[in-house]
């Protein structure tokens, strides 16, 4: 991973935490970890009588299929799936979520965000933080915890510990997802968003995760499945395909990504990861390429020219869907985008076009 990623640390040899952690996992006793997962499932299986044994936070994507496969088919648990709806759904994403329920015979409780509030907060977070998906991301973090407790379900299953996989605030491997809501992926809302009275604190209630104290008092045990089984996004995709998951190419060939199966539920949502390119000089293609290199599927030399070409692209469909939803003109959109270009990595010509001052794999070019 590049050294511009926030929170990422490096050792004295210049190796990033994500690569160090990946190497450490090659010596992990996965049989022992798998048996630990079995013990946890044995503890909760049947704990609610004929009710739900566990809750799984899902989107309908490849990892959601893998999680549900492990918990339902392998562990023989009776899960309830908890999901948050999108601003706009791709048809592929919608069908994949339906497939998750149909193929694994699971019920899904989905929180459909308040569209009026979503439109307002999407615009505010875009203008103020360059994080247009702040509102749905906050719901994704908070909703499963609250809903699991409301249902009386004590085992909550998440997929990947992103802080450990990619490096971040909590760069220590742990089975517990108790601290996930405070891992800095989603920051608290800004008080100034309330100043014009378009929204109130009541509108933001669903974005607030229960405290650690609340979770412990209830007896909630949130876990990362990636602690107990090897986590590989390509392998997860191959497993998901065997259970009916479909990639996006049947519907849409997008720009700016080197795969067709990751984050395919919504187009407008992808503006958020693209903004990483403006701020930190890398985006989705870098993330995926780094994983493929760590998995041993590709070499760094193979991926550098691909990332150089792909990472900078913003799919027009993303812009169209986003502007349509927030009721913003393309001119207004690009004026806000200009605000988020990092002048350390980009320079703007007299016509307003931005040009990178760096080369992938080399850094800044003087």
Model-found features: residue ranges?
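Hydrophobic positions on the alpha1 helix immediately C-terminal to the Walker A/P-loop
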Residues: 66-67
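Nucleotide-activated chemistry modules centered on ATP-dependent adenylation/adenylyltransferase
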Residues: 1-54, 70-366
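Short, glycine-rich nucleotide/cofactor-binding loops
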Residues: 54-63
